[in-house]
Amino acid sequence: MATVVREAFENHVKLVESRNSPGHVLASSEASFFVADLNDIVRKWAAWKKALPDVTPFFAVKSSYDRRLIQTLATCGAGFDCASVEEIELILSLGIGAERIVFTHPCKPVSSLGLCRKLGITLITFDNECELRKLHHHYPEAQTVLRVFADDPTNADPLGTKFGAAREDIDGLVRLVKELNMKLAGASFHAAPSVAVDAAAYVRGIRDAAEVFARARRVGLNPTVLDIGGGYTDSTFQQIAGAVRPAIAECFKSQVVEGRLRILAEPGTLFSCSPFYLAVKVVARRRNAAAFGNEPATRLYINDGIYSNFMMRFIVNMTFSPVAVIRKGVWYDQTEQTMRREACSLWGRSCDSNDCINRDCRLDPEVGVGDWLVFKDMGAYTTVCNTTFNGFTSSNHTIYIEPTQVDKAQSTFEQLELAI
């Protein structure tokens, strides 16, 4: 962790706590807050362009609506994968052009198609006959992208059960595009959500996308866009990139050689997760005379939870463990192997008994009310998942560390040439 991140946390805690006095504690001084190191985004962009230089990242906006994150990616040269009109409007409100957006949701309300037509969002995904006919009726000039089924069957949360055309349906859908005199811009797939580790799922997706291209050419269509989806994380990206490069070279050899292939991807977590750290405050401490089952006797209750920034604990059973404790403005690292630790459990602020962040956490035994716990990798699917359950709201105040190398990473976004 960069020293500047640690200092940002310490300084903010000292500031908010300096405003309190006995009997007069401001609610704002107890609100959880983020520190975001925007330099991390620039480093990730450079790593992406080194590993997959011919693939343009279209950031999956659903993972984070943070405007500074989005603006930094836009400056680097990213496009944007939007799954709703609201996400499209967010991107456009930041002065980012419509040509940098792909509407990736395969099943959309009719009203959104009319708005996309009005706003100039041309690249739109479908995966079934009903959706294609809906597009034909409401937005016939759209540049359609056929999403095919490509999933990792070992994944705990497979997406293929919800979206993606089966191989048996590809031929009929391609022929229907031709029959309706519409444009098939290309093919896409989404191998798995961000817990994916099976790079072979991406290879299967690329091969199925190549089948879409082949069948399209047989009926006189000329697709040029390959969208290899999302699911990339720090731990899986290099493995996936190493499998994707040769698969594209093998399956799309002539298009690559002739410069007739535009390749997109939809990374979300890869860019949004690690730049953000979250500090939450301990609001209560309880020690039971007898442990409940195998749980530790000590329980800590925090001012956040699964209905706020820890929703991924509920969705995919993700484990969260603090990397530091801040006490009276001083940072205490919790990752050092030599430090003394005590078992405890971390509980969220709601009245739901399932609102537990970690049932077996090892922390400084002195942690108590008023201390802050710092968590890393908190940028993806956190603020976007906040609810108002129990009446709680989240301020989600964020302190930004400005990027210093963005000019070196900056590239001019190359507009997709989608004319068929």
Swiss-Prot record:
Application of this enzyme or protein: Loline alkaloids show broad-spectrum anti-insect activity, and different lolines may have different biological activities. In vitro tests of NFL, NAL, NML, and semisynthetic loline derivatives with long carbon-chain acylations on the 1-amine have shown that many are effective against both fall armyworm larvae and European corn borer larvae, but the effects seem to differ depending on the modifications. N-Formylloline reduces the weight gain of fall armyworms by deterring feeding, and does not significantly affect corn borers.
Presence of keyword Lyase: yes
Keywords: Alkaloid metabolism, Decarboxylase, Lyase, Pyridoxal phosphate, S-nitrosylation
Residues given in the record as substrate binding sites: 315-316, 352
EC number, UniProt record: 4.1.1.-
Site (Stacks against the aromatic ring of pyridoxal phosphate and stabilizes reaction intermediates): 190
Active-site positions on this chain: 351 (proton donor)
Residues the record lists as S-nitrosocysteine modifications: 351
Gene induction: Expression is induced in loline alkaloid-producing cultures as well as in planta.
Ranges that cross the membrane: none
Purpose of the protein: Amino acid decarboxylase; part of the gene cluster that mediates the biosynthesis of loline alkaloids, potent insecticidal agents composed of a pyrrolizidine ring system and an uncommon ether bridge linking carbons 2 and 7. Lolines are structurally differentiated by the various modifications of the L-amino group and include norloline, loline, N-methylloline, N-acetylloline, N-acetylnorloline, and N-formylloline.
Subunit and interaction comment: Homodimer.
Protein name, as recorded: Amino acid decarboxylase lolD1
Organism this protein belongs to: Epichloe uncinata
